[in-house]
Swiss-Prot record:
Name the UniProt record assigns to this protein: Probable chorismate pyruvate-lyase
Gene that this polypeptide is encoded by: ubiC
EC number: 4.1.3.40
Matches recorded under InterPro entries: Chorismate--pyruvate_lyase, Chorismate_lyase_/UTRA_dom_sf
GO molecular function term, any single one: chorismate lyase activity
Keywords on record: Cytoplasm, Lyase, Pyruvate, Ubiquinone biosynthesis
Species per Swiss-Prot/TrEMBL record: Xanthomonas albilineans
Length: 202
């Protein structure tokens, strides 16, 4: 098996950008949030580990595709303990097709963990979900994803964002300046402590 190719500058940049991913995507075109799933369920094993939750605990899950100019750029999955979806994170249940950034980056009580990122392969359930929006020629390739935990009133909200091939294809001919992208975050105080883009999603 060949070792994975190193990340290029664009990939490292997008995997480690703080602030709102939706705001960064808006620099590339018109963003639409397409909701795929909203329901209570069991979390995946790696998600239980990240949040330190018992494996029998139900969570509230929301999965969306972030589409830019009719192209799927990001498959995103968020979850919080089911009890928190009725309390600290109850707004997640009613946000509909608005981006979660509308909640996360306007509430100064919300804290954010460091970003962690990795390549995910076909063995991971997130890869299988995301590949519904990937051309067949890319379906077996590893995808790049990042995640962080937002905390409000002591309750966690885990958000995982899987970058799709259409995003990288758009960025190849257009090297957007870093400074321009950061200006889209506005006066948000949720600057994350960044970890290596090769670090594991727990």
């Amino acid at each position: 098996m060949h070792p994975p190719s190193p990340l290029n500058t664009q990939q490292k940049d997008w995997l480690t950008r703080g602030g709102s991913l939706t705001a960064h995507l808006r620099l590339l075109g018109q963003v639409q949030v397409q909701v795929q799933r909203e329901h209570k369920a069991m979390a995946w094993l790696d998600e239980y580990r990240v949040l330190g939750l018992s494996r029998c605990l139900l969570v509230w899950v929301r999965e969306v595709v972030l589409v830019v100019d009719a192209k799927p750029y990001v498959y995103a999955r968020s979850l919080t303990p089911l009890t928190a979806s009725y309390n600290a994170w109850q707004a997640v249940r009613s946000i509909g097709s608005r981006p979660l950034a509308d909640l996360l980056f306007r509430d100064r009580s919300v804290l954010r963990s460091a970003l962690a990122s990795r390549r995910i392969t076909a063995q991971h359930p997130l890869h299988r979900r995301a590949c519904n929006f990937v051309a067949q020629s890319h379906a077996t390739q590893a995808l790049l994803a990042r995640r962080s935990v937002f905390t409000r009133q002591g309750a966690p909200l885990l958000i995982t964002e899987c970058m799709l091939p259409a995003l990288w294809a758009t960025l190849e001919p257009v090297a957007a300046p870093r400074q321009a992208s950061l200006s889209a975050d506005g006066p948000c105080r949720h600057s994350a402590q960044i970890v290596s883009p090769e670090s594991m999603l727990e």
